[in-house]
Amino acid sequence: MDIEIEKIIRTKRKTIALYITDGATLIIKAPFNANDKTIMGVVLKHKKWIEQKKIEIGERDPKFSPKEFVNGEGLLHLGRYYRLKIVGDQEVPLKFENEFYLSRNALPQAKEVFIEWYKKIAYDKISERVRRYAQKRGFKYNMVKITNAQKRWGSSSNGNLNFPWRLIMAPLPVIDYVVIHELVHLEEKNHTKAFWDRVKMLMPNYEKYKGWLKKNSYLLRL
Protein backbone atom coordinates (compact mmCIF):
# COMPACT_ATOMS: atom_id res chain seq x y z
CA MET A 1 0.00 0.00 0.00
CA ASP A 2 1.33 3.46 -0.93
CA ILE A 3 1.28 5.86 1.99
CA GLU A 4 -0.34 9.17 1.17
CA ILE A 5 0.60 12.16 3.31
CA GLU A 6 -2.22 14.65 3.73
CA LYS A 7 -0.12 17.45 5.22
CA ILE A 8 3.33 18.20 6.63
CA ILE A 9 3.37 20.86 9.34
CA ARG A 10 6.73 22.50 10.03
CA THR A 11 7.31 23.66 13.60
CA LYS A 12 10.10 24.38 16.07
CA ARG A 13 9.81 20.86 17.43
CA LYS A 14 12.92 18.65 17.47
CA THR A 15 11.36 15.34 16.44
CA ILE A 16 9.05 14.02 13.72
CA ALA A 17 5.56 12.99 14.85
CA LEU A 18 2.87 11.09 12.92
CA TYR A 19 -0.86 11.58 13.45
CA ILE A 20 -3.80 9.70 11.93
CA THR A 21 -6.90 11.91 11.83
CA ASP A 22 -10.51 10.83 12.38
CA GLY A 23 -10.77 10.86 8.61
CA ALA A 24 -7.95 8.27 8.39
CA THR A 25 -5.50 10.71 6.79
CA LEU A 26 -1.83 11.06 7.76
CA ILE A 27 -0.58 14.35 9.20
CA ILE A 28 3.11 14.86 9.94
CA LYS A 29 4.65 17.42 12.27
CA ALA A 30 8.34 17.91 11.58
CA PRO A 31 11.20 20.30 12.47
CA PHE A 32 11.92 23.11 10.01
CA ASN A 33 15.26 21.51 9.11
CA ALA A 34 13.92 17.98 8.42
CA ASN A 35 14.20 17.15 4.72
CA ASP A 36 11.72 15.03 2.74
CA LYS A 37 14.03 12.01 2.72
CA THR A 38 14.26 12.01 6.51
CA ILE A 39 10.50 12.39 6.87
CA MET A 40 9.79 9.54 4.45
CA GLY A 41 12.26 7.37 6.34
CA VAL A 42 10.20 7.82 9.50
CA VAL A 43 6.97 7.18 7.60
CA LEU A 44 8.26 3.94 6.09
CA LYS A 45 9.59 2.80 9.45
CA HIS A 46 6.07 3.10 10.87
CA LYS A 47 4.25 1.83 7.77
CA LYS A 48 2.55 -1.11 9.52
CA TRP A 49 1.35 1.11 12.36
CA ILE A 50 -0.05 3.66 9.87
CA GLU A 51 -1.90 1.00 7.88
CA GLN A 52 -3.30 -0.61 11.04
CA LYS A 53 -4.58 2.73 12.35
CA LYS A 54 -6.18 3.62 9.02
CA ILE A 55 -8.01 0.30 8.92
CA GLU A 56 -9.19 0.68 12.53
CA ILE A 57 -10.53 4.17 11.91
CA GLY A 58 -12.18 3.14 8.67
CA GLU A 59 -13.98 0.26 10.40
CA ARG A 60 -14.98 2.39 13.41
CA ASP A 61 -17.87 4.00 11.57
CA PRO A 62 -21.05 2.20 12.76
CA LYS A 63 -22.56 2.78 9.32
CA PHE A 64 -19.91 0.75 7.53
CA SER A 65 -21.32 -1.86 5.18
CA PRO A 66 -20.80 -5.63 5.45
CA LYS A 67 -17.50 -7.08 4.32
CA GLU A 68 -16.94 -7.21 0.58
CA PHE A 69 -14.04 -9.69 0.72
CA VAL A 70 -11.78 -7.74 -1.60
CA ASN A 71 -8.00 -7.36 -1.67
CA GLY A 72 -6.71 -5.17 1.14
CA GLU A 73 -9.85 -5.34 3.26
CA GLY A 74 -9.24 -5.59 6.99
CA LEU A 75 -10.71 -8.43 9.05
CA LEU A 76 -10.49 -8.80 12.80
CA HIS A 77 -8.79 -11.59 14.70
CA LEU A 78 -8.06 -11.32 18.44
CA GLY A 79 -8.53 -7.57 18.39
CA ARG A 80 -6.29 -6.78 15.42
CA TYR A 81 -7.10 -6.11 11.80
CA TYR A 82 -5.35 -8.27 9.22
CA ARG A 83 -5.45 -7.67 5.50
CA LEU A 84 -7.16 -9.98 3.07
CA LYS A 85 -5.36 -11.19 -0.03
CA ILE A 86 -7.16 -13.01 -2.82
CA VAL A 87 -4.88 -15.72 -4.21
CA GLY A 88 -4.95 -18.53 -6.74
CA ASP A 89 -5.53 -22.15 -5.91
CA GLN A 90 -4.32 -23.35 -2.51
CA GLU A 91 -4.88 -26.57 -0.59
CA VAL A 92 -7.49 -24.97 1.69
CA PRO A 93 -9.98 -22.17 0.91
CA LEU A 94 -8.61 -19.89 3.64
CA LYS A 95 -5.19 -19.55 5.25
CA PHE A 96 -4.04 -17.23 8.00
CA GLU A 97 -0.35 -16.36 8.16
CA ASN A 98 -0.28 -12.85 9.61
CA GLU A 99 -2.64 -12.02 6.73
CA PHE A 100 -5.73 -13.76 5.41
CA TYR A 101 -5.26 -15.63 2.14
CA LEU A 102 -8.54 -16.52 0.44
CA SER A 103 -8.62 -18.75 -2.62
CA ARG A 104 -10.23 -17.05 -5.62
CA ASN A 105 -12.37 -20.17 -6.11
CA ALA A 106 -13.85 -19.65 -2.64
CA LEU A 107 -14.94 -16.05 -3.26
CA PRO A 108 -18.62 -16.92 -3.92
CA GLN A 109 -18.77 -18.50 -0.45
CA ALA A 110 -16.30 -16.13 1.22
CA LYS A 111 -18.52 -15.24 4.18
CA GLU A 112 -19.32 -18.88 4.93
CA VAL A 113 -15.65 -19.82 4.60
CA PHE A 114 -14.64 -17.14 7.09
CA ILE A 115 -17.37 -18.13 9.54
CA GLU A 116 -16.20 -21.75 9.50
CA TRP A 117 -12.61 -20.61 10.07
CA TYR A 118 -13.64 -18.32 12.92
CA LYS A 119 -15.68 -21.13 14.51
CA LYS A 120 -12.73 -23.50 14.57
CA ILE A 121 -10.31 -20.91 15.93
CA ALA A 122 -12.91 -19.73 18.45
CA TYR A 123 -13.46 -23.25 19.76
CA ASP A 124 -9.74 -23.90 20.20
CA LYS A 125 -8.91 -20.56 21.82
CA ILE A 126 -12.01 -20.14 23.99
CA SER A 127 -11.86 -23.76 25.19
CA GLU A 128 -8.27 -23.17 26.26
CA ARG A 129 -9.24 -20.01 28.19
CA VAL A 130 -12.18 -21.77 29.85
CA ARG A 131 -9.92 -24.63 30.98
CA ARG A 132 -7.36 -22.18 32.31
CA TYR A 133 -9.78 -20.22 34.50
CA ALA A 134 -11.85 -23.25 35.51
CA GLN A 135 -8.77 -25.10 36.77
CA LYS A 136 -7.46 -21.99 38.46
CA ARG A 137 -10.63 -21.43 40.50
CA GLY A 138 -12.22 -24.87 40.61
CA PHE A 139 -15.23 -24.25 38.36
CA LYS A 140 -16.97 -27.37 37.05
CA TYR A 141 -18.46 -27.36 33.54
CA ASN A 142 -19.48 -29.90 30.91
CA MET A 143 -18.49 -28.59 27.51
CA VAL A 144 -17.86 -25.48 25.42
CA LYS A 145 -20.06 -24.79 22.42
CA ILE A 146 -19.56 -22.21 19.66
CA THR A 147 -22.80 -20.70 18.38
CA ASN A 148 -24.15 -18.28 15.79
CA ALA A 149 -25.65 -16.01 18.45
CA GLN A 150 -25.97 -12.40 17.33
CA LYS A 151 -26.95 -10.58 20.52
CA ARG A 152 -25.45 -12.54 23.41
CA TRP A 153 -21.74 -12.84 24.11
CA GLY A 154 -22.14 -15.89 26.27
CA SER A 155 -24.63 -18.12 28.04
CA SER A 156 -24.61 -21.17 30.26
CA SER A 157 -27.10 -23.98 30.75
CA ASN A 158 -26.83 -27.40 32.37
CA GLY A 159 -23.12 -26.86 32.86
CA ASN A 160 -22.52 -26.08 29.19
CA LEU A 161 -20.88 -22.79 28.18
CA ASN A 162 -21.94 -21.18 24.92
CA PHE A 163 -20.04 -18.47 23.06
CA PRO A 164 -20.61 -16.91 19.61
CA TRP A 165 -17.89 -17.35 17.00
CA ARG A 166 -17.76 -13.56 16.66
CA LEU A 167 -16.10 -13.34 20.07
CA ILE A 168 -12.79 -14.53 18.58
CA MET A 169 -12.60 -11.18 16.79
CA ALA A 170 -12.21 -9.39 20.14
CA PRO A 171 -8.94 -8.80 22.02
CA LEU A 172 -7.91 -11.68 24.29
CA PRO A 173 -8.60 -9.80 27.57
CA VAL A 174 -12.17 -9.17 26.36
CA ILE A 175 -12.56 -12.89 25.62
CA ASP A 176 -11.24 -13.65 29.10
CA TYR A 177 -13.81 -11.28 30.62
CA VAL A 178 -16.67 -13.08 28.84
CA VAL A 179 -15.27 -16.48 29.84
CA ILE A 180 -14.99 -15.44 33.49
CA HIS A 181 -18.48 -13.94 33.34
CA GLU A 182 -19.98 -17.25 32.18
CA LEU A 183 -17.95 -19.38 34.58
CA VAL A 184 -19.20 -17.31 37.51
CA HIS A 185 -22.75 -17.75 36.20
CA LEU A 186 -22.38 -21.49 36.78
CA GLU A 187 -22.51 -20.72 40.50
CA GLU A 188 -24.17 -17.29 40.62
CA LYS A 189 -27.18 -17.30 38.28
CA ASN A 190 -28.12 -13.62 38.56
CA HIS A 191 -26.21 -10.36 38.24
CA THR A 192 -26.20 -9.71 41.97
CA LYS A 193 -23.54 -7.88 43.93
CA ALA A 194 -22.10 -11.27 44.85
CA PHE A 195 -21.84 -12.13 41.15
CA TRP A 196 -19.93 -8.97 40.24
CA ASP A 197 -17.72 -9.30 43.33
CA ARG A 198 -16.63 -12.74 42.13
CA VAL A 199 -15.99 -11.47 38.61
CA LYS A 200 -13.89 -8.65 40.06
CA MET A 201 -11.94 -11.07 42.22
CA LEU A 202 -10.95 -13.01 39.10
CA MET A 203 -10.43 -9.93 36.92
CA PRO A 204 -10.00 -6.72 38.95
CA ASN A 205 -10.20 -4.48 35.85
CA TYR A 206 -13.13 -6.31 34.24
CA GLU A 207 -15.07 -3.05 33.79
CA LYS A 208 -12.51 -1.91 31.21
CA TYR A 209 -13.21 -4.94 29.02
CA LYS A 210 -16.93 -4.90 29.68
CA GLY A 211 -16.89 -1.30 28.45
CA TRP A 212 -14.81 -2.21 25.39
CA LEU A 213 -17.36 -4.83 24.39
CA LYS A 214 -20.26 -2.44 24.83
CA LYS A 215 -18.54 0.26 22.79
CA ASN A 216 -17.09 -1.91 20.02
CA SER A 217 -19.46 -4.86 19.66
CA TYR A 218 -20.71 -3.57 16.30
CA LEU A 219 -17.24 -4.21 14.86
CA LEU A 220 -17.38 -7.93 15.60
CA ARG A 221 -19.24 -9.03 12.49
CA LEU A 222 -18.69 -9.79 8.83
What is each of the regions a protein language model found here?
Residues M1-Y177, L186-L222:
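Active-site-proximal or metal-binding-adjacent scaffold patches in catalytic folds
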Residues E182:
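Walker B catalytic acidic pair
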